[in-house]
């Protein structure tokens, strides 16, 4: 309860600092409400013939212990370069296609994604589907598995038997920001109509960040840690406006290795903003000894 109260005060303070022009730009509706479904919606559609629920997790153990009935497991190493963070960049399109088809994803599938233990896992898979041109069929489960369990909805340990899918993909490289391009726009993001946002906790941002980036910790898009529901579209848009977003800008997010930034990317797309994620993120940037800023 105390965390809810603190979060509420922070939100009021944040909204109070938004100018009238920013508030007007914020709007009140998501441009893509279909990208997010509630636990109630999912509970009512569990029997839909074309429904594919994906349990995105880092290991088989958490899936085997409990998952939403009918969910198929897709480990993070099936859609990133490494089995666990920090080795996380996009796999080649043909491998991504094969891994999705193996769990029964087809062109007509309605894909619902939830994370087993960390919401950015689900957002990262959404980003991957967007890269493949399939995000129009996909949505995140608001609140994820935590909310499903909190509401005492049914769980299962059964592994569904599914036929391989047939999925058409088309890579969209424009959603993946590359280091050379980020370096170019970081000199003056506003002139490039870019909002460059660091999705890491503030202490990580202050410890070193890309020049021109603003701090936008991804968890602030949720109500509270123990209530991992997405804030309202109006609140989310106000947050982006406060960070410097203006209509027509491209939101470019990064973090340490591309997990947390995926959630910022998802929120931007949910609101209808042009968005990209710097997949290499701070790990690539710092390893390449690119310019860095410390502090605020």
Model features per residue range: what roles?
Residues 81-109, 220-251:
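Helix-loop module immediately N-terminal to the HCX5R catalytic loop
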Residues 25, 90-181, 256, 260-276, ...:
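Thiolate-centered catalytic microenvironments shared by cysteine-dependent enzyme domains
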Residues 30-59, 70-73:
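Mature N-terminal segment immediately following signal peptide/propeptide cleavage
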Residues 7-17:
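Bacterial N-terminal signal peptides
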Residues 238, 243-296:
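C-terminal soluble interaction/assembly domains
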Residues 1-7:
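Bacterial N-terminal signal peptides that target proteins for export
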Residues 29-38, 44, 80, 145-210, ...:
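Active-site neighborhoods of enzymes that stabilize oxyanions during catalysis
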């Amino acid at each position: 309860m105390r965390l809810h109260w603190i979060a509420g005060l922070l939100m009021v303070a944040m909204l109070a600092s938004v100018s009238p022009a920013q508030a007007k730009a914020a709007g009140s509706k998501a441009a893509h409400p279909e990208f997010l479904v509630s636990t109630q919606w999912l509970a009512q559609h569990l029997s839909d013939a074309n429904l594919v629920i994906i349990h995105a997790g880092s290991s088989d153990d958490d899936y085997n212990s409990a998952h939403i009935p009918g969910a198929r497991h897709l480990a993070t190493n099936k859609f990133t370069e490494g089995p666990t963070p920090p080795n996380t960049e996009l796999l080649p399109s043909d491998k991504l296609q094969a891994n999705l088809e193996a769990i029964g994803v087809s062109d007509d599938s309605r894909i619902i994604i939830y994370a087993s233990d960390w919401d950015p896992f689900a957002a990262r898979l959404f980003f991957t589907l967007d890269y493949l041109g399939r995000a129009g069929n996909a949505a995140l489960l608001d609140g994820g598995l935590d909310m499903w369990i909190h509401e005492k909805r049914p769980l299962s340990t059964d592994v569904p038997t599914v036929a391989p899918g047939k999925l058409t993909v088309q890579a969209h490289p424009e959603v993946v920001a590359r280091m050379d391009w980020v370096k170019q726009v970081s000199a003056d993001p506003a002139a490039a109509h870019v909002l460059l946002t660091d999705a890491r906790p503030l202490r990580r941002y202050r410890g070193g960040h890309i020049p021109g980036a603003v701090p936008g910790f991804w968890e602030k898009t949720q109500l509270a840690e123990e209530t991992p529901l997405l804030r309202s579209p109006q609140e989310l848009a106000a947050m982006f406006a406060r960070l410097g977003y203006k209509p027509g800008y491209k939101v470019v997010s990064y973090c340490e290795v591309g997990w947390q930034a995926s959630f910022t990317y998802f929120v931007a797309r949910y609101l209808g903003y042009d968005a990209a994620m710097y997949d290499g993120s701070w790990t690539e940037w710092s390893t390449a000894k690119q310019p860095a800023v410390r502090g605020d």
